[in-house]
Design a protein with these regions (language model features):
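Acidic glycine-/aspartate-rich tracts in secreted/extracellular proteins
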Residues: 63-66, 101, 162-167, 179
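Noncatalytic modules at the cell exterior or secretory-pathway interfaces
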Residues: 202-218
Length: 218
């Protein structure tokens, strides 16, 4: 620990015979409020947002501009009515990235989304979800914009009907090309119907594979 700040979160320390001690204490409390159970509003914005909420934190990516110039890899915290204070994240620090809806771990340079472990030499185990909203069109099948990632181990695909599906179909299936019912068959068309397409064992896709919805009986 230095004479002026704590080693991990760089909280300012009150100095002997310091005037206006409350300023230093308030700054430390504000930093604690932002850094404990850390939530990053984003780790991808390359410039500060126009009107950040006081205390909101952001992960500054490489090459950031504006007020974030030269702050690559640091945590930017909105403070003092439009200004910014910065903190140095440590390897292994965890955060929830709000605009991505995923937890992330700092690997010493970047926030790794979905990381469950970080190896000494750069390996990692990651888990993540992807979510889309799909509007159906007329036809026997619809290929969604959700692609199962190449090299990823898939454990399931879930779906929910938010508005009743109209037309002559009696039900629908959820799957991928060559396995149109892999994640569900005879699925309902009424609002609130859903598919819990859990696989009996994880499956790896080696090429990007779109999730496909197929009508039955229509």
């Amino acid at each position: 620990m230095t004479d002026h700040a704590t080693p991990r979160l760089s909280l300012p320390l009150v100095q002997a015979a310091q005037a206006q001690k409350h300023v230093t204490v308030n700054e430390s409390l504000a930093r604690l409020d932002g850094m404990v159970n850390l939530v990053l509003q984003s780790a991808q914005l390359d410039a500060p947002p126009g009107q950040p909420v006081e205390g909101a934190c952001y992960g500054v990516p490489p090459g950031a501009s504006g007020a974030w110039t030269g702050q690559d890899g640091r945590i930017a915290m909105a403070a003092n009515g439009g200004g910014w204070s910065y903190a140095e994240p440590r390897r292994g620090m965890q955060a929830f990235v709000a605009d991505r809806g995923v937890s992330a771990v700092f690997d010493g340079e970047l926030w790794v989304e979905g990381a469950l472990t970080l190896g000494q030499f750069g390996s990692a185990l990651m888990a993540r979800t992807e979510e889309i909203e799909l509007e159906l069109t007329a036809g026997g099948s619809v290929a969604s914009t959700l692609y199962l990632p190449p090299g990823g181990m898939v454990i399931g695909v879930a779906a929910r009907v938010t508005q009743a599906i109209t037309g002559s179909l009696s039900s629908w299936r959820l799957g991928t090309e060559g396995a149109l019912d892999r994640f569900g068959a005879n699925l309902g068309t009424q609002a609130g119907s859903w598919a819990r397409g859990m696989l009996s064992q994880p499956l790896t896709y080696w090429e990007p594979a779109p999730v496909i919805l197929t009508a039955t009986g229509g």
